[in-house]
Amino acid sequence: RRGKSAVIENGHIVVLGWSEQVFTIIPQLFIAENGLKNKKIVLLGDRDKVEMEDQIRNRIGSDALRRVVCRSGSPIEMSDLELTNLNEASGILVLTPEGDNPDAEVVKTVLAITKNHQRKSDPYKIIAALKENQNRELGKIVGNGEVEWIFSGQVIARLLAQSCNQPGLSVVYSELLDFTGDEIYFIEDSKLIGRTYREALSSFQKGVVIGLQKAEKVTLNPVMETILRPGDQLVVIASDEQGLIRGERGAVRDEWIASNHAVSKASESVIILGWSERGNELLVELNNYFPPKSKVCIVTDKFDLRQELEDVSSSLKNLKVSFEKKSILDRNELESLKLQKYDHVILLSNDDRTLTIQQIDSNTLFTLLHIRNIVEQGKAKLSIATEILDGRNSRLAEVAKADDFIVSDRLISLMMAQIVSDRRRNAVYEDLFNPQGSEIYLKPACEYIKTGVAVNFYTILEAAARKNETAIGYRLSSLSEDAKRSFGVVINPDKREEVVFTEQDRIIVLAEK
């Protein structure tokens, strides 16, 4: 029977499940470093083998099938799992299924793997995602140390919350998570033992130091005077493991370092258009990131949220939440919202079980085009963060000039591919998306260096270090609409190269909130 014979591969990657994630994860694994490049991928899905192969051929290319072996079966059936030779696999990715209760299916799949009587005695290396943060403890119990969990609902909510007042942040994360860009690596450098973290920052001409791993604990942007001890590892951003290039430290021009300090806004105002299961999580994250007395207005005609919002509002100390029941597809109703009085717009993909993913994205893009036109006509200055479900529609979001667009499944798929390559990366991502500790910020260049003069990145590193921050790159406003130039985002620049910054440009840093 086609797709029902056991595979004989070993050292392979097993992908369990069939969804849109397949078309992001497989190409990423093809170009991954850390020895994954030439490994076979065994895919177990609940579709006909030929159907899966045809879709892979059409969406990824014929060459993909030289490395992908498809098998038909259910990831929760132990007999079907045995087709994939799990005991010899170097990594296992559990995809999030479509349906009403995906977390339950993911948990059952993990149990089918770990409780199989034919399992190996050594721990598996499993990467899986749970949508609901309330299932975090259950995941830890079921995973029993064998699973690297991604809590996808919380990750997307946090990125939307962070992006809405930091245009370009989603591009920074895409650069860090996509194997076509620079990635996160861990290195031990005996030459830096006894030196400080601050000294380590400028030790490489190419390659950005972002943190330290001490005794299995990762700390991003640690105290600048932290001493490196034997066994400590640097957490770095580099093109690959050989991408760290030493060089003589370039001159730091003290006279070009600015002493300006940011003036925090007293409060923020955001309007959320659309609503989904991650809406409450988004409110929690906005409450974490926004100052007291900030305002949030939620607009949708799909649900009456008044009672639900009353219940959740008591725990939101920094937010005053209001609700309007209006259609976000109706131009007149959008204009009646007076968008110009808000600082930020978040466009959420509506939960609507009667629509396909493509139909939901079409509605989102339709609303986005209206918003952009209304904003331009009113000459309002506000940021727009948009959630897209299918990555193939991201090009359309670019045309509609979304400041940030977050493709939910693609982002989680990129994270899964990165973690199966090196599971230590998950600790870095958890730290980055945690409201406590250091996060990524895009701050005005004029807060660090004088604009209108040529400065190298060594000078920017020093300027950031004086604020107890770690600089990792910059964003040029003149390229903010150029997709081919990563919308102006440059991560891990050559530190010797000099750049002339303007008042509109941003320095990308790791900093405390």
PLM regions: where:
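Cytosolic regulatory regions of ion transport systems
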Residues: 1-513
